[in-house]
Amino acid sequence: MSSLKLQKRLAASVLRCGKKKVWLDPNEINEIANTNSRQNIRKLIKDGLIIKKPVVVHSRYRVRKNTEARRKGRHCGFGKRKGTANARMPTKLLWMQRQRVLRRLLKKYRDSKKIDRHLYHDLYMKCKGNVFKNKRVLMEYIHKKKAEKQRSKMLADQAEARRQKVREARKRREERIATKKQELIALHAKEDEIAAKAATAGH
C-alpha cells in the first residue's frame, strides 16, 4: 500500500483546510496514489473520491444551561467559591460603577437646568466623599435641597413683602404727621394774624 501523504497535503491545500479534515476513499487508493498534481486532485474532489470532512460539532448546550442556572443564583454557594470576595467582585470596580451612575445623573440634571453649577459642584464633591450610597439617595437629596431652597426663597420674599409693607405704612404715617404739622402751623399763623389785626384795631 502506497503512502498518500502527498495527495493528502495537496488536497488540504486545494480544499483550504487541515490534513485531518481530508477524507480519501479507501476503495480507490490506487487511483488516488497515481495523482500527483493539484489539477488531478481537483478532478478527484469533483468525482467525490476526496471529500472535506464536516466540522465536528462542539455543543454549547451544557454551557448555556449552566450559565442560565448561574443567573438564577445556582452553583454559586460557598463550596463553589475559590477567590476572596474582593477577587470575585473588586470593591474598586463597584465604586467606579457607582460613581459613574451618580456623575451621569448629576450631568443630566445640570444640562437640563434642574440644578445650577454651584449645587452640581457641591454634590459632585459629596459623591466623591461617599455621601450617597446609590442613585435614589442622591435624587432624594436633590429634591430635598430644591424644596428647602424654594421654601427659604418664599420666606425671604414674604419677609421682604412685610418689610415693604411696614416701610410704606411708616411713610404714609410720616406723611400724615407732616401734613397735620403743616395744617397746625398754618392754623397758628392764621390765629396770630387775626390776633394781630384785632390788637391793631383796638389801638
From Swiss-Prot:
Belongs to the eukaryotic ribosomal protein eL19 family. Residues 152-175 are annotated as: Disordered. InterPro entries: 60S_ribosomal_eL19_sf, Ribosomal_eL19, Ribosomal_eL19_CS, Ribosomal_eL19_dom, Ribosomal_eL19_dom1, Ribosomal_eL19_euk. The gene is RpL19. Residues 159-175 have a biased composition (Basic and acidic residues). GO terms for biological process: cytoplasmic translation. The keyword Ribonucleoprotein applies. GO terms for molecular function: RNA binding; structural constituent of ribosome. One of its GO terms (cellular component) is cytosolic ribosome. The keyword Ribonucleoprotein applies. It comes from Drosophila melanogaster. It comes from the Eukaryota. Keywords: Ribonucleoprotein, Ribosomal protein. This is Large ribosomal subunit protein eL19. Gene3D superfamilies: 1.10.1200.240, 1.10.1650.10.
